[in-house]
């Protein structure tokens, strides 16, 4: 492809000029082949500028950098381009390379601490019911229509993201609904993407290992609402008003407690779902979701608001939500087809607010004791660990503290951090996660409910020196046969 086309709309200067055509773009020097363009990105673990020579040796004919490269004479017959921000440059060039695909599909972005995944699945169900072909990008998997593609992170890097958009355009997708993480906003992965709608679910503590302060975390989320045509905002959340003031374009507020444009009333909750009246202007529909929890009413409202802005009738929205299957690893009752006398629920809750939501939801339909099994991830926000300990212990009859994804940290030390927040004497420590689930199932009695929180849909566990297969749903079904 012609280099000038790739550089369109980008501010840059030539340090060395030679090559005018490139094969493809890469930011990983190991993937560079003859004729490629390599972008030097400064990361948190390493700096791509250190690998410029490696990329050149592998065949790079164009190198884009934001820092001065040493020993320019080394790069014979190579074009070197200087930019002020390599990440923004990667996003712009990736979009140009793939033909600016985000201009050819309607993109709906969902951000917030909790609820993003469920909301994207709700949106997909509604839009498909309305007759559209839909793509989905998120934590569990990526979808182009019915085609499922493995997902490696909530929001892909800009190069992979633009490729997915291009694939959607090629497959004649009408809408893409996507989870937009705070990392992706801060790191410019979605820079230049034209969002038709942006949904704000909520904001609670998470990712402070990365953002350092809560204000930084919030400001990263705000970026989405400054780049969207329309915004759909949870006004019941304490940060909703701030988002409302900063958001551009048309806005719809939603909630249960406060006055808002789109409201849920007459809430009825039970073990297999929730029912509520949805009121928007002069319309009202009673909607019955087959997933429990008040927080899922909020997820539904955000999705409803965005779809109303897209002109989809409330009746169609109701039909789609009522027909929607459960989302993997989100309040998933693994034992519903077994007659055990107790239930085991798997949920992705890995933040204090997420854990509080799932335990409060489970408490609503627990006739016996509520038993929680959870831990905290290694190499992540340490400040939330004692809070997680306190929340889990206070809201459970029995809390079993265990490992999550310890990564490079010692699981015992992570558990120690969790225990610092526990004020009650109702906990057990079982370091091995499978053993912890077994313990919960062994002590469960008639009418008890076990909530296994933290991993949800994940089918792996990240240890210090390896990643192992670990699907809690499989583990639970195996233990049913063993116990």
From Swiss-Prot:
Its cofactor is Mg(2+). It comes from the Bacteria. UDP-N-acetyl-alpha-D-muramoyl-L-alanyl-D-glutamate binds at residues 29, 154-155, 181, 189. It catalyses: UDP-N-acetyl-alpha-D-muramoyl-L-alanyl-D-glutamate + meso-2,6-diaminopimelate + ATP = UDP-N-acetyl-alpha-D-muramoyl-L-alanyl-gamma-D-glutamyl-meso-2,6-diaminopimelate + ADP + phosphate + H(+). Pathway: Cell wall biogenesis; peptidoglycan biosynthesis. ATP binds at residues 112-118. NCBIfam families: murE, PRK00139.1-2, PRK00139.1-4. This is UDP-N-acetylmuramoyl-L-alanyl-D-glutamate--2,6-diaminopimelate ligase. It comes from Clostridium botulinum (strain Hall / ATCC 3502 / NCTC 13319 / Type A). The lineage of its organism: Bacteria, Bacillati, Bacillota, Clostridia, Eubacteriales. The gene is murE.
């Amino acid at each position: 492809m012609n280099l000038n086309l790739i550089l369109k709309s980008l501010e840059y200067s030539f340090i060395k000029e030679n090559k005018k055509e490139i094969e493809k773009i890469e930011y990983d020097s190991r993937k560079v082949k003859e004729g490629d363009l390599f972008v030097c990105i400064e990361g948190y673990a390493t700096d791509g500028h250190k690998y410029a020579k490696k990329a050149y040796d592998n065949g790079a004919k164009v190198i884009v950098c934001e820092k001065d490269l040493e020993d320019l004479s080394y790069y014979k017959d190579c074009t070197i381009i200087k930019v002020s921000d390599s990440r923004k440059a990667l996003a712009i060039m990736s979009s140009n390379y793939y033909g600016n695909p985000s201009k050819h599909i309607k993109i709906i972005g969902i951000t917030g601490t909790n609820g993003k995944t469920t909301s994207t699945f709700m949106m997909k169900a509604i839009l498909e019911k309305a007759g559209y072909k839909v793509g989905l990008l998120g934590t569990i998997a990526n979808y182009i229509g019915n085609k499922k593609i493995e997902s490696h992170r909530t929001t892909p890097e800009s190069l992979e993201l633009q490729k997915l958009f291009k694939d959607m355009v090629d497959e004649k997708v009408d809408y893409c609904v996507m989870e937009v993480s705070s990392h992706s906003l801060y790191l410019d992965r979605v820079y230049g993407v034209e969002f038709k709608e942006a949904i704000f679910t909520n904001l609670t503590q998470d990712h402070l290992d990365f953002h350092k302060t809560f204000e930084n975390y919030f400001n990263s989320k705000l970026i989405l609402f400054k780049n969207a045509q329309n915004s759909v905002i949870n006004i019941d959340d304490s940060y909703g008003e701030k988002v409302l003031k900063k958001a551009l374009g048309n806005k719809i507020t939603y909630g249960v407690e406060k006055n808002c444009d789109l409201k849920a009333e007459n809430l009825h909750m039970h073990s297999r779902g929730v029912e509520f009246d949805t009121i928007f202007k002069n319309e009202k529909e009673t909607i019955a979701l087959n997933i429990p929890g008040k927080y899922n009413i909020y997820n539904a409202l955000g999705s409803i608001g965005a779809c109303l802005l897209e002109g989809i009738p409330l009746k169609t929205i109701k039909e789609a939500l009522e027909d929607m299957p459960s989302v993997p690893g989100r309040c998933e009752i693994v034992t519903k087809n077994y007659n055990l006398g107790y239930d085991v629920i798997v949920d992705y809750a890995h933040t204090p607010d997420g854990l509080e939501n799932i335990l409060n939801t489970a408490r609503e339909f627990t006739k016996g004791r509520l038993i929680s099994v959870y831990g905290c991830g290694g190499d992540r926000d340490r400040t939330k660990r004692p809070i997680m300990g306190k929340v889990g212990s206070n809201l459970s009859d029995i809390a079993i503290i265990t490992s999550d994804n310890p990564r490079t940290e010692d699981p015992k030390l992570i558990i120690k951090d969790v225990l610092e927040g526990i004020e009650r004497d109702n906990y057990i420590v079982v370091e091995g996660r499978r053993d912890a689930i077994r313990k919960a199932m062994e002590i469960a009695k008639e009418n008890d409910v076990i909530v296994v929180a933290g991993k949800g849909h994940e089918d792996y566990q990240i240890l210090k020196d390896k990643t192992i297969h670990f699907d809690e749903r499989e583990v639970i079904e195996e233990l049913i046969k063993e116990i």
